[in-house]
C-alpha cells in the first residue's frame, strides 16, 4: 500500500530550473522573436489581445532543435514534480511562452484550463527569468499552499501547480519582470 497523498491544491517550487545565463539568453531570444501584446481567452471563447485582464507582452518559444534543451528541462522536472505531488495523467507540453511585465502590467486572477476537450491543461509551470532586484512589487500569486514559497522570486526558480488553481501575476511598480510559462497537457479528466 502506498502512502502517497495527492496534493491537488498545492504548488511546488524548484529553485534550480534554469541558470542565470540561461534566463538571460531566453530574454534576449524573446526580444529577437518579437514581444507582442499577450492574448487572453475571453469568457465568450474568443481570443483577444486588448484586455484589461492581461496587459503584459509575450512571445512563443517554437518547438525547434535550438530549444530542445529547454523543453527537455521542463518535461523532466514536470515528471519528477508530478510523480511526487499530483500523479496527473500528463502526456505532453504546449508551446512555451515568455511573458514580460513592465510597470503596472498584470494578469488578473484566472485559471489556465478552459476546456474539457483533450488535450487538457493539467499543470502550469512558471519560471522566473528576472532576478528579484530587477523589479519591485509584482510576482506570481497562487491560491494554493506553496511548498518552498521563500524561493519563488529567485531567478531560475520555477513554480508548478494544477492548471485549475486560480492564480495571477501582480504588476511590478518598478522594473521589468520576465517569466517562462509552460502548460503540461493530458487526456480529459476522469
Q: What do the PLM-derived regions correspond to, one by one?
A:
Residues 1, 41-42, 46-48, 94, ...:
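A general, composition-driven signal for non-globular sequence regions
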Residues 2-85:
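Non-heme Fe(II)/2-oxoglutarate
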Amino acid at each position: 500500500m502506498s502512502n502517497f497523498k495527492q496534493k491537488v491544491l498545492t504548488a511546488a517550487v524548484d529553485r534550480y530550473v534554469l541558470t542565470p545565463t540561461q534566463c538571460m539568453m531566453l530574454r534576449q531570444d524573446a526580444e529577437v522573436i518579437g514581444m507582442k501584446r499577450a492574448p487572453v481567452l475571453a469568457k465568450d471563447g474568443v481570443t483577444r489581445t486588448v484586455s484589461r485582464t492581461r496587459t503584459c507582452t509575450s512571445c512563443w518559444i517554437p518547438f525547434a532543435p535550438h530549444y530542445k534543451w529547454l523543453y527537455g528541462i521542463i518535461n523532466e522536472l514536470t515528471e519528477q514534480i508530478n510523480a511526487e505531488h499530483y500523479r496527473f495523467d500528463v502526456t505532453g507540453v504546449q508551446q512555451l511562452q515568455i511573458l514580460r511585465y513592465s510597470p503596472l502590467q498584470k494578469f488578473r486572477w484566472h485559471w489556465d484550463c478552459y476546456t474539457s476537450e483533450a488535450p487538457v491543461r493539467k499543470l502550469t509551470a512558471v519560471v522566473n527569468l528576472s532576478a528579484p532586484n530587477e523589479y519591485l512589487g509584482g510576482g506570481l500569486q497562487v491560491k494554493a499552499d506553496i511548498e518552498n514559497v521563500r524561493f519563488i522570486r529567485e531567478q531560475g526558480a520555477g513554480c508548478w501547480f494544477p492548471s485549475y488553481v486560480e492564480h495571477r501575476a501582480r504588476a511590478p511598480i518598478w522594473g521589468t519582470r520576465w517569466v517562462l510559462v509552460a502548460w503540461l497537457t493530458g487526456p480529459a479528466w476522469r
